[in-house]
């Protein structure tokens, strides 16, 4: 993709910030198609289980909350100032899914060795057909463009390993996951199936009231207890599982005695939850700290916080995402 065109797209998107809101950015359909095609080639050229190095900043669900994505970058540093890993769910629910995914794809193309995107359960045609992305594409462009995004999403990697110690994915563990080569060997492009390893990596949830595996209230995949987290980490000589997929009040929440963390990066999710958003910073020594993007309060103030020593709390089962 032409560097000048790419830089122009990034500049347009980043400069959309208008006080506390972001204005709609109209990119040409041709430019968006080019973003999808170029990003797809890069996704397929890199492994399905990315092997990354710290320092890196890890972000959870963004869900079309474009102004909050820009706030994350303002706080963490716009690429290439920092390395980033996003854990999926870029589209649906929020008002600006197109701007959100286009900026993320543009950064992936420009900084392919420093900026990484995993697949979430909403990067799937059968889900984003229902929860807003299809309608946004159809209203602002056309259904063909939605199909182009689908082709791109079907090539996204599904997990990442940071310094061989922190395993990251959107959803969680799978009863089918015995070794990490199984993730490396998932063929792409692929649609998300209704069950099995790929489905679980994108859909599973931890459950503090459970031992072993349980039924998931979502009607898809499983829930897993702290025992399964400990067993998996010990077997693979890992320190931590980092995942997203659930709204948590403080933007991050520990589980299984700090062996698993949920990171959620869309504050005031859907305008319905009063949650904060968080970004997890992993430094060279693999120490994790959390930068908090507070939900704007009634007076419209925006707050930031930094916390690296919160006591662990189990994932909250309220909001589903």
UniProtKB/Swiss-Prot annotation:
Its EC number is 3.1.3.16. The active site is at residue 122. The keyword Manganese applies. It comes from the Eukaryota. Binds 2 manganese ions per subunit. GO terms for cellular component: cytoplasm; nucleus. The keyword Chloroplast does not apply. Gene3D superfamilies: 3.60.21.10. Residues 298-321 are annotated as: Disordered. InterPro entries: Calcineurin-like_PHP_ApaH, Metallo-depent_PP-like, PP1_catalytic_subunit, Ser/Thr-sp_prot-phosphatase, STPPase_N. CDD domains: MPP_PP1_PPKL. It catalyses: O-phospho-L-seryl-[protein] + H2O = L-seryl-[protein] + phosphate; O-phospho-L-threonyl-[protein] + H2O = L-threonyl-[protein] + phosphate. Mn(2+) 1 binds at residues 61, 63, 89. PANTHER family: SERINE/THREONINE PROTEIN PHOSPHATASE (PTHR11668), SERINE_THREONINE-PROTEIN PHOSPHATASE PP1 ISOZYME 6 (PTHR11668:SF504). Belongs to the PPP phosphatase family. PP-1 subfamily. This is Serine/threonine-protein phosphatase PP1. It comes from Medicago sativa subsp. varia.
